């Protein structure tokens, strides 16, 4: 018997999402206009909370759908305007270009990356050293690349590892649905579950590594560029200015990596199953034996393109997204990928997230129009100069964990610059505040996927359901890093930032403009 029209509409609405989730979203859509009529300020914060809820439930339904519906309603009822949303999108075009082109460009370097990381994984048997190497590699790369790019690299490697073993475990040689475990017997499932735990820990170490490295340089994160430009700093200036905070944080972060692996805390410590190692070793041996000269040329070309990528980003020869586009063009041209459909596959991972980020910019527009952060900013600027550093750091951290890092960093640096230009604070204090804003925006935000775009990208990637990495599990595994990075960063802002910066000036390494 065919279902009713109403039932059919209900089933189509948000597809396979649970009924309670669908009902919750409908309630949000009904309540928001009513609250907006009473108090636009409260309605604005309610919208932010609802959007965070959709992100937290990312595995129930991709946040683009419910978040998009909330954003459309927000524009429709007047919480913001379509023109303001367009302005926010235009202001963040660099980030969108990064997602569209840089992430896709990495897709065409997966052969080289899989080769390198397979050798790394097979040559380092100690899980502690392997975790440390992933964290250090991610930190180093994210000092020159955007964190999203680095996470995209590690995701592609992890999916490659998982796919190799999954095909063996399911006794299927051709490409299969990696989420389908129905053809795997109980013995293989136990090993597969251990392998998932192993990959989860590596992904989290790498993800935190991007935060450790990304905060150190002006090209590490999009907001770093904005802050560096506002302060008039170049690459070397930015690194030295941040180092009183970022260097101790990096050291403590790496020690935390070793500690959680050693003590098997917070879901870490899972080792690579020997059976999986054997499969990966066989795959590596087979790949090397079957590698033709044409394949070797591809690897060499990809390595050269990798050098170009790091060099172009370090010297900021062009916008990040345009450099990514050059990677796509060079990699496809020189490795023989000419089919439109083959090229199109590179964009399947990044474009949904690009659309999601665009939706988020509409929420940012609401935050600005409803002046949701104004009371916080006014409170901070009324404090003493010494207290301002810690308060800027703390409030940046709190807001960055629930909002867009680029937005939070931009708002605070603009407010600090306005205060400096009006004479409320000195130029020297402004430069110290710029460091507090940058570190406060980057470090505490590892607490949730909402704060780190790289974490959110990981959570909503094709890898997350494969390795059972949910929102809650990600927050739990990030907790030791959150505590260490946040507290060490705060202590450095409080006690070492001003004296070390003063010493740098006396040595002539940096100067106030």
Curated annotation (Swiss-Prot):
It is found in: Cell inner membrane. Keywords: Antiport, Cell inner membrane, Cell membrane, Ion transport, Membrane, Sodium, Sodium transport, Transmembrane, Transmembrane helix, Transport. The chain crosses the membrane at residues 23-43, 52-72, 97-117, 120-140, 144-164, 202-222, 238-258, 303-323, 348-368, 391-411, 447-467, 475-495. It catalyses: 2 Na(+)(in) + 3 H(+)(out) = 2 Na(+)(out) + 3 H(+)(in). InterPro entries: Na+/H+_antiporter_NhaB. One of its GO terms (cellular component) is plasma membrane. The keyword Cell wall biogenesis/degradation does not apply. Its main location: membrane. It is a multi-pass membrane protein. Pfam families: NhaB (PF06450). The keyword Secreted does not apply. One of its GO terms (molecular function) is sodium:proton antiporter activity. Na(+)/H(+) antiporter that extrudes sodium in exchange for external protons. HAMAP family: NhaB. Belongs to the NhaB Na(+)/H(+) (TC 2.A.34) antiporter family. This is Na(+)/H(+) antiporter NhaB.
């Amino acid at each position: 018997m065919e279902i009713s029209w109403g039932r059919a509409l209900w089933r189509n609405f948000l597809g396979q999402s649970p009924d309670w989730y669908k009902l919750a979203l409908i309630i949000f859509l009904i309540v928001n206009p009513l609250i907006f009529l009473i108090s636009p300020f409260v309605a604005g914060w309610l919208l932010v909370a609802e959007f965070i809820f959709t992100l937290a439930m990312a595995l129930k339904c991709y946040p683009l759908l419910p978040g998009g519906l909330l954003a459309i309603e927000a524009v429709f009822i007047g919480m913001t305007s379509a023109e303001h949303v367009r302005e926010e999108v235009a202001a963040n075009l660099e980030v969108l270009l990064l997602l569209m082109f840089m992430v896709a460009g990495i897709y065409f370097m997966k052969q080289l990356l899989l080769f390198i990381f397979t050798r790394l994984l097979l040559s380092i048997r100690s899980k502690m050293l392997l975790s440390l190497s992933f964290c250090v590699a991610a930190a180093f790369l994210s000092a020159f690349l955007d964190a999203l790019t680095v996470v995209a690299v590690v995701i592609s490697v992890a999916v490659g590892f998982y796919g190799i073993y999954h095909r063996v475990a399911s006794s299927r040689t051709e490409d299969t649905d990696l989420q389908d475990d129905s053809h795997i017997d109980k013995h293989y499932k136990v090993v597969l579950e251990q392998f998932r735990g192993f990959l989860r820990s590596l992904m989290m170490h790498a993800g935190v590594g991007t935060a450790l490295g990304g905060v150190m340089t002006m090209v590490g994160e999009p907001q770093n560029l904005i802050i560096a430009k506002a302060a008039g700093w170049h690459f070397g200036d930015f690194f030295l200015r941040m180092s009183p905070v970022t260097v101790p944080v990096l050291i403590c972060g790496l020690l935390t990596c070793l500690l959680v692996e050693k003590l098997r805390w917070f879901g870490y410590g899972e080792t690579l199953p020997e059976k999986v190692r054997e499969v990966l070793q066989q795959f590596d041996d087979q790949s090397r034996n079957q590698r033709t000269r044409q394949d070797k040329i591809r690897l060499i070309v990809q390595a050269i393109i990798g050098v170009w990528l790091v060099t172009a980003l370090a010297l900021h020869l062009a916008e990040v997204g345009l450099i990514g586009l050059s990677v796509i063009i060079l990699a496809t041209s020189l490795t023989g990928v000419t089919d439109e459909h083959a090229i199109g596959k590179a964009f399947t991972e990044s474009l949904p997230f690009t659309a999601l980020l665009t939706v988020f910019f509409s929420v940012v527009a609401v935050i600005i129009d409803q002046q949701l952060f104004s009371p916080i900013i006014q409170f901070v600027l009324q404090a003493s100069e010494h207290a301002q550093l810690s308060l800027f750091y703390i409030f940046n951290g709190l807001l960055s964990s629930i909002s867009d890092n680029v937005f939070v960093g931009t708002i605070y640096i603009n407010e600090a610059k306005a205060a400096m230009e009006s004479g409320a604070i000195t130029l020297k204090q402004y430069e110290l505040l710029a460091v507090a804003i940058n570190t406060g925006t980057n470090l505490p935000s590892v607490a949730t996927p909402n704060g780190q775009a790289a974490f959110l990208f990981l959570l909503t990637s094709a890898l997350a359901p494969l390795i059972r990495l949910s929102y809650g599990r990600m927050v739990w595994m990030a907790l030791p890093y959150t505590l260490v990075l946040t507290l060490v960063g705060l202590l450095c802002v409080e006690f070492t930032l001003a004296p070390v910066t003063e010493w740098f000036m006396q040595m002539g390494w940096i100067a106030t403009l």
